[in-house]
């Protein structure tokens, strides 16, 4: 017993000294909430980090230090400081933390977790390849899949035959359950088209065991990457618990298997000697670009291509699908704005809305941005790591080398310096061109590569949905606006009642 007490007090002493030395290593060291040994500030952050961290951030004027176990973090929400770090001093703050690399693959593959010169070369490779497939055909495909999903709803939704007519035209309501699966299915379908040039119907996808397994794998993987799973890595004395990450990587192996099958099939089809070959998707384009630049493919490059495809599949599916969930929730809870958007779309005098119409839908665009501002999908972004020590903010704040950095997107969104009445939902807020844009897609060279296709999906799907249907909750009461935190933030899953417009 005496030995156990000695070890316990030794651990307390170790952490106390570690915290004190780090917090006092420079006269400009950051302030933050008082940590307790072993836990650091975990008990103050609580399980709702996306809600508590913005409150702490406001108290410390947009930048503070935080201890997660034995790991030192800097959290920043002040826009000027974010720009200074992520744009003006990008080279010092461009890398991801090691933990995130551990869970997404090694640092030589993909785009989400790689660092340094490898990230530079992969970013250049992806931009060359991505531009070749991001064209009008993709926007046409998004519209096609949106209309296909509407038809699927009408054929497979639950029709309320016994209730009275829901409108003066005698249209019956259609109940749509499992909305999350269908919204994610739409985005996953678009990703499969862009990455692998595959086009499958929603009927086939809804009945497909493989498709449901892909959907489940992505959600499980992202749920496993939330801050409280990562904390195991922060508590250095509990490193054996990191075996849990093996299970996370196992979940990713199913996606790796799919990428391998697609690559092996595609490499047999490509004629590298033909000048007439045209890339039909991202996979084609990646293969051809590397082959042209490097005069052939080696094993490491092949693994890199597959990892890039997996990164696009995961990131492009969950974030866009969750954004659609939030926007529809706010449309249901604010029917007066739903009607205003419909009138805006109706003035276009078109039976279907395309990406080219975005410039003529300012209120819808503002509604989307305001929802994104109040409910950012990645409220704490993905962690970065400083390479060298640096003093920022007009020589006010000292950032040590090898420090983990969190960009507090939610804190930025709730800052009165950026937005008037930031806690209020004002869908016309962004009609004023002087209002600051959101940070939902990041900032600087390492922002979201897929921003354009994501916003096109959101606009095309929502505009045509509103043009063709009125949306309600099943009981005509407001939908709950509870937040479920993983790597992204989603609302509580809900069902929808749709009524066809005439």
From Swiss-Prot:
CDD domains: CYP1_2-like (cd20617). The keyword Cytoplasm does not apply. It is found in: Membrane. Pfam families: p450. InterPro entries: Cyt_P450, Cyt_P450_CS, Cyt_P450_E_grp-I, Cyt_P450_sf. The keyword Iron applies. It is a single-pass membrane protein. Keywords: Heme, Iron, Membrane, Metal-binding, Monooxygenase, Oxidoreductase, Transmembrane, Transmembrane helix. GO terms for cellular component: membrane. It comes from the Eukaryota. Its EC number is 1.14.-.-. GO terms for molecular function: heme binding; iron ion binding; monooxygenase activity; oxidoreductase activity, acting on paired donors, with incorporation or reduction of molecular oxygen. The chain crosses the membrane at residues 3-20. Heme binds at residue 448. Its cofactor is heme. Belongs to the cytochrome P450 family. This is Probable cytochrome P450 554A1. It comes from Dictyostelium discoideum (Social amoeba). The lineage of its organism: Eukaryota, Amoebozoa, Evosea, Eumycetozoa, Dictyostelia.
């Amino acid at each position: 017993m005496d030995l156990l007490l000695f070890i316990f007090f030794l651990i307390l002493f170790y952490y106390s000294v570690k915290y004190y030395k780090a917090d006092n290593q420079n006269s400009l060291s950051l302030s933050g909430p008082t940590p307790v040994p072993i836990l650091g500030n975990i008990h103050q952050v609580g399980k709702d980090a996306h809600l508590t961290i913005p409150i702490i951030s406001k108290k410390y004027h947009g930048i503070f230090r935080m201890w997660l176990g034995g790991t030192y973090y800097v959290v920043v929400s002040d826009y000027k400081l974010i720009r200074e770090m992520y744009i003006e001093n990008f080279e010092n703050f461009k890398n991801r933390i090691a933990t995130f690399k551990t869970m997404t693959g090694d640092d030589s593959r993909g785009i989400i977790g790689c660092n340094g010169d490898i990230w530079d070369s992969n970013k250049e490779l992806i931009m060359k390849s991505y531009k070749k497939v991001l064209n009008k055909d993709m926007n046409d495909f998004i519209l096609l899949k949106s209309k296909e999903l509407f038809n699927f709803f009408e054929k497979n939704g639950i029709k309320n035959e016994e209730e009275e007519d829901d409108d003066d035209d005698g249209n019956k309501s259609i109940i749509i359950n499992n909305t999350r699966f269908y919204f994610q299915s739409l985005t996953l379908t678009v990703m499969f088209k862009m990455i692998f040039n595959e086009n499958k119907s929603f009927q086939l996808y809804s009945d497909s065991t493989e498709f449901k397994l892909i959907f489940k794998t992505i959600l499980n993987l992202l749920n496993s990457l939330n801050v409280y799973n990562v904390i195991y890595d922060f508590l250095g004395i509990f490193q054996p618990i990191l075996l849990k990450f093996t299970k996370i990587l196992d979940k990713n192996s199913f996606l790796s298997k799919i990428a391998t099958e697609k690559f092996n099939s595609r490499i047999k089809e490509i004629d590298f000697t033909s000048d007439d070959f045209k890339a039909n998707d991202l996979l084609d384009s990646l293969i051809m670009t590397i082959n042209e630049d490097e005069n052939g493919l080696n094993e490491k490059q092949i693994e890199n291509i597959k990892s890039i495809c997996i990164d696009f599949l995961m990131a492009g599916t969950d974030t866009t699908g969750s954004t659609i969930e939030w926007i529809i929730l706010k449309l249901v809870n604010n029917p007066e704005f739903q009607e205003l958007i419909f009138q805006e779309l109706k003035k276009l005098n078109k039976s279907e809305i395309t990406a080219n119409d975005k410039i003529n839908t300012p209120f819808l665009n503002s509604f989307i941005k305001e929802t994104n501002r109040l409910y950012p999908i990645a409220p704490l972004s993905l962690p970065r790591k400083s390479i060298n020590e640096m003093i920022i903010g007009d020589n006010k704040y000292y950032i040590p080398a090898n420090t983990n950095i969190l960009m507090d997107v939610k804190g930025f969104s709730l800052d009165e310096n950026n937005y008037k009445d930031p806690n209020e939902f004002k869908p016309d807020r962004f009609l004023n061109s002087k209002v600051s844009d959101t940070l939902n897609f990041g900032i600087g060279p390492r922002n979201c590569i897929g921003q354009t296709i994501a916003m096109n999906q959101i606009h095309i799907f929502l505009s045509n949905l509103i043009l063709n249907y009125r949306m309600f909750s099943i009981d005509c009461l407001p939908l709950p606006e509870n937040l479920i935190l993983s790597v992204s933030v989603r609302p509580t899953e809900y069902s929808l009642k749709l009524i066809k417009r005439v």
